[in-house]
Structures are given as C-alpha cells and as structure tokens.
Amino acid sequence: MKKIDIKILDPRVGNEFPLPTYATEGSAGLDLRACLSEAVDLLPGQTTLLPTGLAIHIGDSSLAAVILPRSGLGHKHGVVLGNLVGLIDSDYQGQLMVSVWNRGQQPFTIEPGERIAQMVFVPVIQAEFNLVEDFDLSERGTGGFGHSGRQ
C-alpha cells in the first residue's frame, strides 16, 4: 500500500468524523466527509463547495487522485459533483474541497460529517508530444461520435 501525506485541518477529523478509510479489502475509493459546523440545505439546481477538513500532498508525479460522486447520493437524491470529477495533482498541498450540485427536484440537507464523495488514486503517465505530418492509418481512422452505430 502506497503512503500518502495528509494533514488534518479540522480537529473533528479523526475524532467526531472518521479519517478516510477503505470500507472493504476490495474498495477502490476512500469516503470523504463534509466538515461542516452546521447542516447545509442544497436547493434544486444549487451548487456549493464543501470542505473536508483534510489537506493532501501526493508527492509522486506518477500518481493523482480523483474525487468521484457516491452512487447512492446521485441515484437516490440527485446530488452529484458540481464539476463531475475532481482531479488532485500530485503537487497540490491544499485542502480537499468537494463541489456538490443538487440536480434533483427536492432540497437535500448535507449534515456535518456526512459522506459526500469518494477519492480514488490513479496512475499518471505524463506524455511528450511527437509532431507528425500524418498518422499511420488505423482501422478506425477519423471515425468519431457514433461511428460504430448501435450494437
């Protein structure tokens, strides 16, 4: 298991609110919690930025983290990430913030300490571009959106 540096910015994290952990041995994501002083009402169509009370420094350019929605919040309540996916670069050292968007029809209340998103670590390959005049032909070529039809 890879070690990643985190800093607790809110003393409730690790006490009132658990540190992010993997729920099972096969879990890919760590739950992030809303580090709030009081409940936040998220009206339909509204977005807001929620603190997690944690700062992170991955420190390894071959890794990044992505913040993803929790499936139950989106499916049952229409609450998803405001930016759809959050990307945490390896050299970022600030607080993890989660943008949430209520795309549902009903107000949704986010309680202090509630699990609001999940964080997954992913490998990164930094590419260097090789300028060419033409590409070697492939079977697909320039076929884009919908080029293979409905199967």
UniProtKB/Swiss-Prot annotation:
Pathway: Pyrimidine metabolism; dUMP biosynthesis; dUMP from dCTP (dUTP route): step 2/2
Required cofactor(s): Mg(2+)
Top-level taxon of the source organism: Bacteria
An example molecular function term from Gene Ontology annotations: dUTP diphosphatase activity
Family annotation (SUPFAM superfamilies): dUTPase-like (SSF51283)
Keywords linked to the UniProt accession: Hydrolase, Magnesium, Metal-binding, Nucleotide metabolism
Job description of the protein: This enzyme is involved in nucleotide metabolism: it produces dUMP, the immediate precursor of thymidine nucleotides and it decreases the intracellular concentration of dUTP so that uracil cannot be incorporated into DNA.
UniProt protein name: Deoxyuridine 5'-triphosphate nucleotidohydrolase
